[in-house]
């Protein structure tokens, strides 16, 4: 019989849908298992095979756990708010909702074709009003707890896009979307007080089964450090500086303020106002990432003012420097160029003094003055001495600081969740009540922003201006929207109870499913999404509305999928199919030599592979199999369509083996042993997520199994059941072909018996006077007499003419003839 995936795959996909095979149930008699993908943004480009690595891995685990008898939740949804759909709307006038729905339909078609076992009854998009009603409600929980507030913030603002951007949405001073210039501006924004949970976010990492690299990234992002705050007096107020090295205080030769520091205007002398204003303007065109990058030179400008050193009382020049950020510490740095590389670069750039106050061993030197004797001290002892001095003289105090800053939550966009707040003229505001949610955005024709810092919602006067019946006052709706992160902060909780119209989730369902047992997604989300989701979850835990302190028990980052790209230097990428190899070099149709690389699959590099093309040619099961075979789940891997073809050839052989007339009711030990060993290897591989080893295990199995004269039917059935998580369509077809009822998953995961793993034979080492002379494969239950006779025969040429004084016999291991 011939294997034809085109005939069987759609048939079994319809069977799964009609039978609701993957519908999750809260069954208290079963152990639950919640396996989740980081859900995708439904872009117009659709999926390429790079996206499928993680999706295939979670699907294998979900199918395996169902077969083991777990109650499995394996859902899929859409992170559907975001800037790309809005930019497309600006260019074309097409409503973002229409674009999003079209893209989702395409994504669903692609995922269905791969045979993924999602519980489609729980599907939703973050742009569904039924969903973002609860996003708005959860935001209001943060607001009511004082964790959401408005403040004037230095932000990355893109005039062309008309919105604030996160650092991750900027590259080399330009927006990732569209490549438009970005500048720094002070704007009134909504902010979430994530810093209030800094310690909980740090401590919670210790309990998580996550990659150490991800945990370290989050620790670095939070950036907890202990030190001291030091007060430097000026004519216009006190400059508070945070330092982790109070023991170097005597070595301060300048202060550097962030350009956004509130004292800059007051401290700038009349003579310096013009150059300071110009410097601040230039700084506004730089992102924070650019400002703190490791440059060989540092930029800055003198304010014309001085501060008094708290110990020596010397006058210290006050500079403005863009490498100082307003959000960390106090937005001011004490420059100790002798003992800080950045400070030294700055001092050398502007010819400032360099005063050494530590010797090579880290012992304080040159650090004594009246009432202050630091010389000879080092390390924590020296730091504590300075802190005690500062506290006793009311010049500072011990302090813990964090790099983590409160989360800028506003976006000046249309396609995002409206923030459910009404503002009044006196500066007060009112959160909307539950019955007023969801707050829907108005239908508009022009999606462009309304002036600096105002999103397109601000244009719709009849929507913005309201009479609030609760307070009997005229008010204005908030015109900022939430960032795309908002919907992804809690979607995993909504999957527990996706269509609850009375609450974001029912308590008993959250208690049943949470936490997520396995979460797989890209390493690019290591900090922001994962940190923001943990923050919201810990707020909910403190509020008593979730039962676990952490949302994601185990995290795995899949590696990147690389593919060959072809680029004309200085011009751009070309499609691989038009590149030609001539005389050992790759050239474009124009004859220009190409730069050939292995790079991450992407639309921009023209090296993405449409999975549907591969499915049409080789079948979904072959694509799934190669997606795992291509390399370890967490490592980068190079994609090869030839590899998919190889997996298709294996499936052809497997189909032929199962459909062979050699399959019979038989208890052939060797055949059963091969099947049991296969199942054990597949089980171990799935448990350890070493999924790349599974295809080779099957290939080794079939190479040995087809040598048998008879294929024991029970062994064949075991192999089919073991293949089902990886290649589900062919497994379903073959399961029925073997005479079973449809639904291979219902048959359970095959049990492995130890006696078949050990085999019927053992290898005996035969020695003469301790030297290896032969090996024997003999039956395990062979008697001592049989073993000795066979051993003597195998070593006969070494025993000829010799007297055997003793035969040492170690059962199942060796025979040693002493002659």
From Swiss-Prot:
ATP binds at residue 603. A motif ('KMSKS' region) lies at residues 600-604. It catalyses: tRNA(Leu) + L-leucine + ATP = L-leucyl-tRNA(Leu) + AMP + diphosphate. PROSITE patterns: AA_TRNA_LIGASE_I. It comes from the Bacteria. It is found in: Cytoplasm. Keywords: Aminoacyl-tRNA synthetase, ATP-binding, Cytoplasm, Ligase, Nucleotide-binding, Protein biosynthesis. Belongs to the class-I aminoacyl-tRNA synthetase family. This is Leucine--tRNA ligase. It comes from Chlamydia trachomatis serovar D (strain ATCC VR-885 / DSM 19411 / UW-3/Cx). The lineage of its organism: Bacteria, Pseudomonadati, Chlamydiota, Chlamydiia, Chlamydiales.
């Amino acid at each position: 019989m011939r294997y034809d995936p085109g005939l069987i795959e759609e048939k079994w996909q319809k069977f799964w849908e009609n039978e609701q095979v993957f519908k999750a149930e809260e069954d208290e008699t079963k152990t639950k298992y919640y396996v989740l993908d980081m859900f995708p943004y439904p872009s117009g480009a659709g999926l390429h095979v790079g996206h499928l690595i993680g999706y295939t891995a979670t699907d294998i685990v979900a199918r395996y756990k169902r077969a083991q008898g777990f109650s499995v939740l394996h859902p899929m949804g859409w992170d559907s708010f975001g800037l790309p759909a809005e930019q497309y709307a600006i260019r074309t006038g097409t409503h973002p909702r229409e674009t999003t729905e079209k893209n989702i339909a395409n994504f669903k078609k692609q995922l269905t074709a791969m045979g993924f076992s999602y519980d489609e009854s729980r599907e939703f998009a973050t742009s569904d009003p039924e969903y973002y009603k609860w996003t708005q409600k959860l935001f209001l929980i943060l607001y009511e707890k004082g964790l959401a507030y408005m403040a004037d913030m230095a932000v990355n603002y893109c005039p062309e896009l008309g919105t604030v951007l996160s650092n991750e949405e900027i590259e080399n001073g330009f927006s990732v979307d569209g490549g438009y210039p970005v500048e720094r501006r002070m704007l009134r924004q909504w902010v979430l007080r994530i810093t209030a949970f800094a310690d909980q976010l740090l401590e919670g990492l210790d309990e998580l089964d996550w990659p150490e690299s991800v945990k370290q990234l989050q620790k670095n992002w939070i950036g907890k450090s202990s030190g001291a705050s030091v007060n430097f007096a000026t004519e216009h107020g006190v400059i508070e500086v945070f330092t982790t090295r109070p023991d170097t205080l005597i070595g301060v030769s300048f202060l550097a303020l962030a350009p956004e520091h509130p004292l800059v205007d007051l401290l700038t002398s009349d003579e310096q106002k013009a150059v300071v204003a110009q410097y601040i303007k230039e700084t506004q065109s730089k992102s924070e990432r650019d400002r703190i990058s490791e440059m060989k030179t540092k930029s800055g400008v003198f304010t014309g003012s001085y501060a008094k050193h708290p110990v020596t009382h010397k006058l210290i020049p006050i500079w403005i420097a863009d490498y100082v950020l307003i959000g960390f510490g106090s937005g001011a740095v004490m420059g100790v160029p002798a003992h800080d590389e950045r400070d030294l670069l700055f001092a050398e750039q502007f010819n400032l003094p360099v005063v050494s106050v530590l010797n090579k061993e880290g012992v304080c030197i040159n650090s004594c003055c009246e009432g202050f004797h630091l010389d000879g001290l080092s390390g924590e002892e020296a730091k504590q001495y300075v802190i005690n001095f500062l506290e006793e003289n009311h010049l500072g105090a011990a302090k813990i600081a964090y790099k983590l800053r409160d989360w800028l939550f506003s976006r000046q966009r249309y396609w995002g969740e409206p923030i459910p707040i009404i503002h009044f003229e006196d500066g007060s505001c009112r959160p909307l009540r539950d019955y007023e949610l969801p707050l829907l955005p108005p239908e508009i024709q022009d999606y462009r922003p309304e002036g600096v810092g105002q999103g397109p919602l601000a244009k719709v006067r009849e929507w913005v201006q309201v009479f609030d019946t609760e307070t009997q006052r005229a008010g204005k709706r908030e015109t900022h929207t939430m960032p795309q992160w908002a919907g992804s902060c809690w979607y995993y909780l909504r999957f527990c109870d996706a269509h609850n119209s009375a609450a974001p989730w029912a308590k008993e369902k959250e208690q049943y499913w949470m936490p997520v047992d396995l979460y797989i997604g890209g390493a690019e989300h290591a900090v922001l999404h994962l940190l923001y989701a943990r923050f919201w979850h810990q707020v909910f835990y403190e509020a008593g509305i979730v039962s676990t302190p952490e949302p994601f028990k185990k995290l795995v980052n899949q590696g990147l999928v690389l593919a060959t790209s072809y680029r004309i230097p200085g011009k751009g990428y070309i499609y691989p199919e038009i590149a030609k190899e001539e005389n050992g070099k790759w050239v474009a149709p124009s004859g220009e030599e190409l730069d050939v690389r292995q790079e991450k699959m992407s639309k921009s590099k023209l090296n993405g592979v449409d999975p549907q093309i591969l499915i049409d040619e080789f079948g979904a099961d072959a694509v799934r199999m190669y997606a795992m075979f291509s390399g370890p789940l967490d490592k980068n891997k190079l994609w090869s369509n030839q590899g998919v073809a190889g997996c298709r050839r294996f499936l052809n052989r497997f189909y032929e083996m199962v459909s062979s007339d050699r399959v019979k009711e038989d208890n052939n030990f060797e055949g059963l042993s091969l099947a049991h060993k296969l199942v054990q290897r597949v089980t171990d591989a799935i448990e350890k997520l070493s999924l790349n080893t599974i295809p080779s295990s099957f290939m080794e199995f079939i190479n040995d199994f087809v040598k048998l004269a008879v294929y024991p039917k029970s062994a064949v059935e075991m192999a089919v059941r073991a293949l089902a998580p990886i290649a589900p369509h062919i497994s379903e077809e073959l399961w029925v072909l073997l005479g079973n009822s449809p639904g291979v998953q219902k048959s359970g995961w095959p049990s492995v018996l130890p006696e078949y793993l050990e085999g019927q034979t053992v290898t005996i080492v035969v020695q003469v006077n301790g030297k290896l002379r032969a090996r024997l494969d003999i039956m395990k239950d062979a008697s001592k007499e049989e073993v000795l006779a066979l051993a003597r025969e195998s070593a006969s040429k070494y025993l000829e003419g010799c007297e055997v004084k003793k035969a040492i016999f170690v059962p199942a291991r060796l025979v040693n003839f002493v002659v």
